[in-house]
Amino acid sequence: MKKKITKEEINELDRYFRLANYLSVGELYLLYNPLLTRPLDIKDIKPNVVGHWGTAPAQNFIYTHLQRIIKKYDLNMIYISGPGHGGQAVVANDYIDGSYAHMYPEFKEGDETSLKKLFKQFSFPGGVGSHVTPEVPGSINEGGELGYSLSHAYGAVLDNPNLIACCVVGDGEAETGPLACSWQLNKLINPETDGIVLPILNLNGYKIANPTILSRIPKDEVIAYFQGMGYKPYLVKGDDPKKMHKLMAETLDEIISYINKIKKESKTHTFRPFYPMIILETPKGWTGPKEVVGTFKSHQVPIIVNKENISNLKILESWLKSYKPEELFNTDGTIKEDIKSFCPPLEKTCGLNPSTNGGIKKELILPENLDKYALKVKRGQTQSEDMRNLGAYIKDVISLNKDNYIICGPDEALSNRLNHVFEATTRKWNTKIIKQDELLGRNGRVIDSILSEHACEGMLEGYLLTGRHGFIHSYEAFVRIIDSMVSQHAKWIKMAKEIPWRKELSSLNILLTSHCWQQDHNGFTHQDPGFINHLLPKKSDTIRIYLPFDTNTLISTFDHISRTKNYINLVVASKHMRPQWLTMEEAIKHCAKGVDELSWASTTNGKTPDIVLACAGDTPTLEVLAAVSILKEKKPELKIKVINVVDLMKLESNDKHPHGLTDKEYDKLFTTNKPILFAFHGYPNVIHELTYNRTNKDMHVRGYIEEGTITTPFDMRVLNKIDRYHLILDIIKYVPKLQKDKSLQEYCVSMLEKHKKHITTYGCDMKEITSWKWN
């Protein structure tokens, strides 16, 4: 039964709500005269009003009621704003409860001067953005690119059993693919060890200019939809603020009681509850000018106020006065004390909840010594699976960090050879398990029981943003699904670094395998190394790209990135059986340098090379070394310098990237005047772009050139002309003294012909490839 709410409580709620709305309108429009102490003048209005109103009043309404229940029930709660825009609403609430002034002491007086500053800064040059940016205390989801709020919320509550994440989902946002999938994430939550997500669907009826689907279908259909998703929907509908306050307050009281019941029962029963959610149906632009309330026209700036539309000044003034500011502010512009006392204690506010600023962070414990994981290597003779060996290292990371480390991926942990991980944990799963299922458990550290890359990435981001650790792994081609999502996280990191009070977060570590050179069995659709290109233009103090080429370089690289903060680290690695090249000691030294000569492979004997052979990635390295072995036999007089790149950004100039080599270092390594043939894992333009300003312009790159099909592993390399024979044919072109003797060229052409005939006859690579060993 719903608890009755008194008239006094309704009045308190309404005063707070009116204040939040007044501030939100002021932030949108006003430059001066924040208290309306005189009639509004056009000079009081921002010359360029930028922002959105449509979602703000509903978010203010929700926040108003969260303040009440946080205080009443002493809740540990965060607020996640999913709807696009409406950033001024969250700023307004932070301002009212004092969390804004706590982070920005220049607002501590809370008077008319502070109010003027608050209004001016919103969507104003040198001020703050129109979304819930990292500058906003309590934010972990900006809400610019839509669809990620709910997965962020579910990531935030993992291993955070006392937390309630109230996630407001716009009804337009609910139509995005990532958000539509995220409703299913409640199946992965264990109510005993995880917190609770309280989704609130803001059903205001419109997007920018179109109606929303969920607002136009029958309510019983909407309710049935969410029941089918595993939720217990509560409908809060209306447009009369006081009636709505009563309904919302009573509903939230009932929900808190229900959440407490779920938490209590979870200690003694293994079950998946129906989690509460609210369907909040209010008019878009609620409480705004009557001409636009409930229409899509309230989405952005509901009324235009400028010199050409000066008559609208009166409408704006009437709108602001409808909130009765004289009842909300003292004469000096400070907020009335009874409204301030309505708020929870400062340390309990959503704006200052430690979860939103890395405050629950426990430092990641990593193995002290990599020798335990070292693969004993006989150079070029030993064969092993890099990803499988890395799994043994990650297994121990999980054992050392039982409640603050997760592994995310779309049902690929076994496919990507992380088998050893399951010696220490299971997949996280909290719904029906049947006899033939494997590796499922309520408290697993592996989040890969949902197939959406968006959902996996979103949960990991939510986990990292609340101070924990982990990584996502994916097939290389299909990480492209989250291109823009990772871009948004890069923007978040960039901005957060510039905010003094934002704490460092663990890096977003992305491990790509099943890459383009190992997708001969799946074909063209599974071959796309373009995620490297996607990350390359991002801020140099944020992006790191690594291409380890054997087990020991992979383990060394992964150990390194796991220790970093505030980066996006990309690692591309092999999962198939491959030749092994470096001991762990050699790997650690090589990875620390990031790029270096493989002196054991070079044939210069300390003399000036005829050609530089460079490589980055496991497959290009294999083919370069195979080419060298052929040349050592057939042209022993040829002086070849072999360079391997693990840290791709070493190729960038040091004045553009902190990892970059100086020109002097680069020239010493690559020479200033000898031809460079670079075999690269991805698209060739990446290397050309990174080395564009270097002295030596005699750069020739082989890489993936969009040639692929279902074929053999070696044929994939042949199709893209990155194989040993094509590399030697290139070397002949670039080293004039090799052009006189046609035998080497004829040998390569004949081997390519033999290869083609062999695969089309037998369906597998010839022995010269499969049995090749370094010597």
Identify the role of each PLM range.
Residues 109, 315-380, 726-739, 743-754:
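N-terminal leader/propeptide and maturation segments of large enzyme subunits in energy/redox metabolism
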Residues 2-52:
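Cofactor-/ligand-binding subdomain signature composed of acidic, glycine-rich
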Residues 118-139, 148, 160-166, 175, ...:
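Thiamine diphosphate
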Residues 45-52, 77-81, 139-140, 166-170, ...:
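Short glycine-rich or small-residue beta-strand-to-loop segments that form or flank ligand, phosphate
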Residues 10-11, 47-48, 59-77, 137-138, ...:
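Short alpha-helical segments and helix-capping/turn motifs at coil-helix boundaries
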Residues 34-190, 419, 458-459, 463-466, ...:
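Cofactor-binding active-site loop characterized by glycine-rich and histidine/acidic residues
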Residues 53-57, 66, 79, 98-103, ...:
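Non-catalytic terminal/interface segments that mediate subunit docking, oligomerization
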